[in-house]
């Protein structure tokens, strides 16, 4: 299921960049107690007023879409992997970074 989360974030990044393209960066880091994954894009960014809703089921800014991808991603990360996912930063016209932190099993 975790692979699906990364796939969904990547597809959203492609959609955010549109036909002009851009860049997607996947950053993976390991610390003593956690694994960190960041998915960044150079897309249109998320408006401040929409940030609190991005993980809400049914919320979408796309013309086509159900608004379920990010809510399912959050559920998978939190309930199945006991981690956290959030928008690390987003700037309209410049892009967005989602961050996932997973605790390492000791």
Enumerate the predicted regions with their spans.
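Short alpha-helical Gxxx[C/S/T] motif in the catalytic ATP-binding
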Residues: 69, 73
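Glycine-rich ATP-binding loops of the HATPase_c
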Residues: 81-89
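Short conserved segment of the HATPase_c
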Residues: 46-57
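Acidic ATP/Mg2+-coordinating residue in the GHKL
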Residues: 41
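Detector for a conserved hydrophobic position within an alpha-helical segment of the HATPase_c
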Residues: 77-78
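Short beta-strand/loop element within the Bergerat-fold HATPase_c
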Residues: 23-33
């Amino acid at each position: 299921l975790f692979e699906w989360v990364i796939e969904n974030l990547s597809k959203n990044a492609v959609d955010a960049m549109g036909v002009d393209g851009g860049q997607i960066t996947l950053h993976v880091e390991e610390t003593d107690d956690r694994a960190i994954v960041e998915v960044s894009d150079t897309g249109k960014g998320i408006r401040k007023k929409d940030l609190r809703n991005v993980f809400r089921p049914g919320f979408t800014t796309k013309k086509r879409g159900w608004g379920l991808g990010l809510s399912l991603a959050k559920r998978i990360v939190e309930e199945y992997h006991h981690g956290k996912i959030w928008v690390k930063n987003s700037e309209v016209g410049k892009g967005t970074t989602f961050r996932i932190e997973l605790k390492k099993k000791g």
